[in-house]
């Protein structure tokens, strides 16, 4: 990974609008019992439905903890990519990379989210 001293804007990059076409979506498999009722069982069922719907039109990558990896892989369809990744919550927006583009190159911007 190359870390730059410039900002994306300085290099001619911008964050595409949410409605812009994009390559794929990153989601985090629900796990935390303090965020999800009843051991996240109902949340996981709904999550699988959401992932399956999104995957009809774009690539989906699901990040799951080591503890939940096999469960996620079993519950999700085979065409949805599952990767093992530790996380603190299901909100990828708070700590996954933000992708920016200059029209031909894509960069990931990292964040140091402190959970407020």
Feature roles, as predicted:
Residues 1-116:
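Histidine/cysteine-enriched polar flanking segments
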């Amino acid at each position: 990974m190359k870390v730059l001293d410039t900002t994306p804007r300085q290099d001619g990059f911008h964050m595409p609008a949410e409605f812009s076409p994009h390559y794929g979506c990153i989601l985090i498999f629900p796990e935390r019992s303090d965020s999800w009722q009843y051991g996240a069982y109902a949340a996981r069922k709904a999550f699988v439905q959401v992932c399956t719907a999104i995957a009809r039109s774009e690539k989906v990558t699901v990040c799951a903890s080591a503890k939940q990896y096999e469960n996620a892989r079993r519950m999700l369809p085979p065409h949805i990519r599952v990767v093992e990744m530790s996380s603190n919550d299901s909100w990828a927006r708070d700590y996954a990379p933000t992708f920016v583009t200059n029209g031909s190159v894509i960069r990931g911007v990292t964040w140091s989210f402190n959970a407020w």
